[in-house]
UniProtKB/Swiss-Prot annotation:
The lineage of its organism: Eukaryota, Fungi, Dikarya, Ascomycota, Saccharomycotina. It is found in: Nucleus. This is Mediator of RNA polymerase II transcription subunit 17. Keywords: Activator, Nucleus, Transcription, Transcription regulation. Residues 156-186 are annotated as: Disordered. It comes from Scheffersomyces stipitis (strain ATCC 58785 / CBS 6054 / NBRC 10063 / NRRL Y-11545) (Yeast).
């Protein structure tokens, strides 16, 4: 229907029938109450504003309202007609779209709406990222919570800044207020101030670099001095801050020691001076504060029924031989680690000698032998107590220090024997691994305390045996002629002249006794004093052979083996020898 050059379209729903009915067009007469009331609220607003007068007026003037609506439509169409050609084309496109199927039109408008929403969301996200990046230099925590993950990975925080720009009017007023002659001076002042700031910054940077260079030079010079001292360095992590560091091995693990403390330390760098400090770590790679201990030997002799101190070893070591303090610290830690390992090995051996007058009390090993007491004590090192280190209170007279040299020799013997044990372990590690070598590595015990105690007891056993023989010879001197020959340490006669061979082999000594009776019969008694692998047990092997005449004895012919027996007690062998000699005299 055309009117004034425009056309109107009226849609009659009944013309399509029920089969072709548009689902988006609803018949108001067929709406339910639940659907009708919301539409009325949308069109007429709330029921509170409905009055009888307004309803009557609406009923009386339906045409006036339609004409007003038509006038509004015409006015809007005239305004559209006055638009530009581009707006007219948009209007024609819109009219063309209205001629499409309603479902297609709805889907198209829905797609346009989603695009607009996505565009708005993108612009909002960009704006939020811009603001977040802008405030990141001032409030980084707040910016991290609002910035997008992609921008956070791509752009570092604080990289965007802002400044305040004044208006042109303010600049003009400021320029007018400043005198023309003062403007160059202000600019020169700013430039001069900037130059001073840059100069100071460069000077500070140069000083910092020089300090860093001096620190690094001092650090690496000290590292080089440690390396020049033939120390073993390795890379590690500092347990304090897990930073990379250089460590040093000051222990004896590579020399054959199996002590639990491997002797590892961190050479920590001082961030202020650049110097390195010596910081030991334990087997769990944790920092530890060590208490240094050293071994002291004492000898107490029995005098008038009381045991008095007659000898004490001296602490002989100087930890200031090098001009570098770090070298002195390493040598000091190495010395006390050796002392700690030595006392540990001595304690291991002493536990197996409890039945031989050896006892362990706290940090002290006590050995009772031959009316003397030998004390091996682990003493805390105090470098400020010179009186104790130099035995000032012990050396009060000559008699109280008569055994000082003996104590010093015992201490040196222990240290040398521990070095021999290291060498033995090192040879086992270098051999081809077999079941025997593995067993030896896990079951080997050092020979440090046992050789000393065994040889002391062996000397006492020789004296006791000599006294027994002397008593028996004196008892039968009227009936027998005696000839005695003593061969001490007979097992070492045909060996090399190694002074330590005596310390690692069980001692063996022999007594050869030849007795001649009045009937010219000869009795040969061979006594052998030895021990087992414990070094402290007494084993006496006795062999008795009888000859009828001197010729048989000299030719070692027709000898009769009278007795062959072993003893572990001097009282028993004395009785046996007494009976043997008595039987020989009477027979």
């Amino acid at each position: 229907m055309f009117s004034n050059g425009h056309f109107h379209i009226d849609l009659d729903p009944d013309a399509y029938g029920d089969a072709n009915k548009d689902p988006f067009i609803q018949d108001e007469d067929k709406l339910t109450i639940a659907e009708l009331i919301p539409r009325i609220l949308i069109e007429r607003n709330s029921f509170l504003n409905v009055t009888e007068e307004s309803l009557q007026e609406e009923i009386d003037n339906p045409r006036a309202e339609d004409e007003a609506n038509n006038e509004v439509d015409v006015a809007s169409e005239l305004d559209i007609g006055d638009e530009s050609v581009e707006n007219g084309s948009i209007l024609m496109a819109t009219l063309a779209e209205t001629s499409l199927d309603p479902v297609e039109l709805f889907q198209k408008q829905k797609l346009d709406l989603s695009k607009s929403i996505n565009s708005a969301l993108n612009e909002t996200s960009l704006s939020l990222d811009f603001v977040s990046l802008l405030i990141s230099s001032v409030k980084p925590n707040l910016a991290k919570s609002t910035i997008s993950p992609h921008l956070n990975k791509s752009v570092p925080l604080g990289s965007l800044n802002s400044d305040r720009l004044s208006n042109e009017n303010d600049d003009d007023d400021r320029n007018k207020s400043v005198a023309p002659k003062e403007t160059p001076k202000v600019g020169h002042g700013w430039k001069l101030e900037s130059l001073h700031k840059v100069t100071s910054l460069f000077r500070e940077a140069s000083e910092n670099l020089n300090e860093q260079v001096l620190k690094e030079r001092r650090y690496w010079n000290m590292i080089n001095s440690v390396l020049t001292n033939d120390e073993v360095l390795f890379k590690t992590r500092d347990p304090l801050n897990n930073a990379r560091a250089i460590g040093v091995k000051y222990g004896y693990g590579d020399s054959g020691s199996n002590f639990h403390d491997k002797g590892l330390a961190i050479l920590r760098k001082d961030t202020v001076t650049g110097e390195i400090s010596f910081n030991p770590i334990n087997y769990a790679h944790k920092l530890t504060s060590k208490v240094f201990r050293y071994i002291r030997i004492k000898i107490l002799s029995e005098i008038d029924g009381d045991f008095m101190l007659t000898g004490q070893s001296l602490f002989e070591n100087d930890f200031s031989s090098s001009k570098d303090q770090i070298i002195n610290d390493i040598e000091k830690a190495r010395f006390f680690l050796f002392e700690e390992d030595l006392f540990y090995q001595l304690t291991r051996e002493a536990k197996t000698l409890i039945n031989y007058n050896v006892s362990i009390i706290s940090n002290k090993i006590i050995i009772e032998i031959n009316n003397e007491i030998i004390e091996i004590e682990s003493v805390v090192y105090d470098e400020n107590n010179d009186d104790e280190l130099n035995n000032y209170y012990q050396n009060i007279n000559a008699y109280s220090s008569i055994n000082n040299g003996k104590c010093q020799l015992i201490l040196k013997f222990f240290k040398i024997m521990l070095c021999c044990y290291y060498k033995y372990n090192l040879k086992l590690k270098q051999k081809i691994p077999t079941s025997l070598t593995k067993w030896k590595q896990s079951n080997s015990h050092p020979l440090v305390l046992r050789p000393l105690l065994g040889n002391i007891r062996h000397e006492l056993n020789l004296k006791n045996m000599q006294s027994i023989i002397d008593r028996l010879i004196a008892k039968f001197k009227e009936s027998l002629e005696c000839k005695l020959q003593v061969d001490k340490f007979a097992n070492l006669e045909h060996r090399s002249e190694n002074p330590f061979q005596k310390s690692i082999e069980r001692p063996v000594s022999k007594f050869n006794i030849v007795l001649k009776s009045k009937r010219s019969a000869y009795l040969k008694i061979d006594l052998e004093l030895t021990t087992n692998e414990i070094f402290v047990n007494l084993i006496i092997n006795m062999n008795v052979i009888k000859f009828k005449c001197e010729d048989d004895f000299k030719n070692n012919f027709n000898g009769v083996n009278v007795l062959q027996i072993n003893f572990n007690d001097f009282h028993e062998i004395e009785e046996c020898l007494d009976w043997t000699l008595l039987n020989f005299v009477n027979g």
